[in-house]
Amino acid sequence: MTGAVTSAYWLAAVAFLIGVGITAALYAKLEGSRARTRLAALAVIPGFAGLSYVGMALGIGTVTVNGAELVGLRYVDWVVTTPLLVGFIGYNAGASRRAIAGVMIADALMIVFGAAAVVSGGTLKWALFGVSALFHVSLFAYLYVIFPGGIPDDPMQRGLFSLLKNHVGLLWLAYPFVWLMGPAGIGFTGAVGAALTYAFLDVLAKVPYVYFFYARRQAFIDVTDSRAAAKGDGPAVGGEAPVATGDDAPTAAD
């Protein structure tokens, strides 16, 4: 691993850890808000990614198999954090548990087959990459076909769903091309270029999630409220819906 690659990993780790710090600040600001526990759960995404990049910078989990270098912690990070990203999108869309589990499993299998392709050669490499690509396509089917059909007719929920869906969907179009062009594929770009690109994409895909959730927190709270109403739980007091106050109240940014 070259010095430039190590530097790229450290820079990504710092970016993710800053993201965790921002999450902590937002968590404190949302004291008393029903959105607080959701924000804490979202912190797992930049937090786990940051720890993974620290390990990658230290060379932990990087092995050579059949002459190919596998950055193991990169794939461990992806198999943990990216299913959470798409699962959260499904939850925001009001999707069923089965659909959310389906998109998360498809995401994890995409990562697993991609990792297997890295350490394979010849026809097997491209066959495994093809299987990974099929799972990648299935993710877009969930994001752009299945999930949109079940979103409540609420502008805030639809707006947040569209933001998250397009943020992840557009960024993830780049990943298979980086893989193809990099050392794992045809080798058009080197390890340094691939490492820099992956680090940039990872940070851009994950850290802003906390901000998106905070900026449109009222829409996410509405998801919880609408589900409670659908189950017949209804308002808790006097037949009136709870009134959002303090940091839960809608703002111009919402």
UniProtKB/Swiss-Prot annotation:
User: Record's superkingdom?
Assistant: Archaea
Q: Which GO terms describe its cellular component?
A: plasma membrane
Which residues are modified to N6-(retinylidene)lysine? Answer: 206
Q: InterPro entries, per this entry?
A: Arc/bac/fun_rhodopsins (IPR001425), Rhodopsin_retinal_BS (IPR018229)
Q: Which residues lie on this side of the membrane: Extracellular?
A: 1-4, 58-71, 120-123, 183-190
Q: Which CDD domains match?
A: 7tm_SRI_SRII
Q: Region Disordered: which residues?
A: 231-254
Arranged from A to Z, the UniProt key words for this protein are: Cell membrane, Chromophore, Membrane, Photoreceptor protein, Receptor, Retinal protein, Sensory transduction, Transmembrane, Transmembrane helix
Which segments sit on the Cytoplasmic face?
27-35, 94-96, 152-154, 224-254
Location comes to:
Cell membrane
Q: Which GO biological process entries does UniProt record here?
A: phototransduction
Question: According to Swiss-Prot or TrEMBL, what is its membrane topology?
Answer: Multi-pass membrane protein
Q: Which GO terms describe its molecular function?
A: monoatomic ion channel activity; photoreceptor activity
Transmembrane region(s): 5-26, 36-57, 72-93, 97-119, 124-151, 155-182, 191-223
What Pfam families is this protein classified in?
A: Bac_rhodopsin
Described by its record, this protein's role is as follows: Involved in the control of phototaxis.
Say which family it is in.
Answer: Belongs to the archaeal/bacterial/fungal opsin family.
In Swiss-Prot or TrEMBL terms, this protein is called Sensory rhodopsin
Per the UniProt record, the source organism is Halorubrum sodomense
